[in-house]
Amino acid sequence: MFRIFKMSFAVIIIILALIAFNYTEHTSVIQSVMLVFLGAVMFMQGLEERKKENDGSGAFNIYTAVFVWSVSLIGFTLHII
């Protein structure tokens, strides 16, 4: 079940990447959306590693996901301004 969820996120990221290459005039918005999905996948990987190892591993993926989400929020804000 969890693997299907992760694979669907990967497919969505690939579709968004194809759209970004086809419509280059709108890439600033699409790149921010792709960063949100990338952050979600990294966050889920971090939670999965943390659950498997039962220690501090996976924290790097979670921190990286938060960083990616903050960059995407900055991208959305700059696009709106």
Swiss-Prot record:
Q: Where are the transmembrane segments?
A: 4-24, 61-81
Transmembrane helix: is it a keyword of this entry? yes
The UniProt keyword set, sorted, is: Cell membrane, Membrane, Transmembrane, Transmembrane helix
Q: Which Pfam families match?
A: DUF3953
Q: Matching InterPro entries, A to Z?
A: DUF3953 (IPR025018)
Q: Name its cellular compartments.
A: Cell membrane
Q: Which GO terms describe its cellular component?
A: plasma membrane
Query: What topology in the membrane does the UniProt record assign?
Result: Multi-pass membrane protein
Q: What is this protein called?
A: Uncharacterized protein YczI
